[in-house]
């Protein structure tokens, strides 16, 4: 049974949204600089909505990504990292995967549109998604400015363990190129050295990690960088993620006392 009459839902939603905005405006200094988002639940949303073709869920989820990034920009967030395609996702049915990669390529090109004035960077191995999609993604990202008020990382062909391995390999390769001895190579493997060779090198670690669809795990997302991140989970599937959900995540983050493992 409906507790709230349908005609009142929209006004009450807008009122709640306004109150959340006002509360966040009063605590702007407590907002995260970097938000990382696992956009989970596209297929489940499609099935629960009665669609046999799960690619419809991906398309609706893609539209939500650009919308969510605008929320971040409007809120004053400096950097957002969005998990679009993991290395594990590459094992899906070939037809489903091809549709997903096409949708991801389209949404990244939308994110990179000049009208947004966002600086966009890919994190992951584009060599895993095929030559043509990789070419389109590189072209789109290279067209964005290096200096901007809002930066976006799109994680495509990304695996957290793979990133750490790649960082260590890059670190050791640089040391070898400089003629390092075996002992010097061992000494070179430090927290700072690995951090400097991650895909996100030069960027702050995420302050807040958001995951939709009720799953409460990282699934390999930014394993190194999220060691001290705050986590926020919601039952909503990604296509159904609302602005008030986003504002609630920011509100909850601003109320937390970060301990950084201490």
Swiss-Prot record:
EC number assigned by the record: 2.5.1.68
Sample GO molecular function, one term: magnesium ion binding
Binding site for Mg(2+): 40, 230
Matching Pfam families: Prenyltransf (PF01255)
GO cellular component: plasma membrane
Cited function: Generates Z-farnesyl diphosphate (Z-FPP) from isopentenyl pyrophosphate (IPP). Z-FPP is the precursor of decaprenyl diphosphate, which has a central role in the biosynthesis of the mycobacterial cell wall.
Protein name as annotated: Short-chain Z-isoprenyl diphosphate synthase
Protein species of origin: Mycobacterium bovis (strain ATCC BAA-935 / AF2122/97)
High-level lineage: Bacteria, Bacillati, Actinomycetota, Actinomycetes, Mycobacteriales
């Amino acid at each position: 049974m409906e507790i709230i009459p349908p005609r009142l839902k929209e006004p009450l939603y807008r009122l709640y949204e306004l109150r959340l905005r006002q509360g966040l405006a009063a605590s702007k200094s407590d907002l995260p600089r970097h938000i990382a988002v696992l956009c989970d639940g596209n297929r489940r949303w499609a099935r629960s909505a009665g669609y046999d073709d799960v690619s419809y869920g991906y398309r609706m989820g893609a539209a939500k990504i650009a919308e969510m990034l605008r929320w971040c920009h409007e809120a004053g967030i400096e950097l957002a990292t969005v998990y679009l395609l993991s290395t594990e996702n590459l094992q899906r049915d070939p037809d489903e995967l091809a549709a997903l990669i096409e949708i991801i390529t389209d949404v990244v090109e939308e994110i990179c549109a000049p009208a947004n004035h966002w600086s966009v960077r890919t994190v992951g191995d584009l060599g895993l998604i095929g030559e043509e999609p990789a070419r389109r993604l590189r072209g789109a990202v290279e067209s964005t400015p290096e200096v901007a008020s809002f930066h976006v990382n799109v994680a495509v062909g990304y695996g957290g363990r793979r990133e750490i391995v790649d960082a260590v390999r890059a670190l050791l390769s640089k040391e070898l190129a400089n003629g390092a001895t075996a002992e010097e190579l061992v000494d070179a493997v430090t927290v700072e050295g690995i951090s400097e060779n991650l895909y996100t090198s030069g960027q702050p670690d995420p302050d807040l990690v958001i995951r939709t669809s009720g799953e409460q795990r990282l699934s390999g997302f930014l394993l190194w960088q999220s060691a001290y991140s705050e986590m926020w989970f919601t039952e909503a599937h990604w296509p159904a993620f609302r602005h008030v959900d986003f504002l609630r995540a920011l509100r909850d983050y601003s109320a937390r006392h970060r301990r950084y493992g201490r």
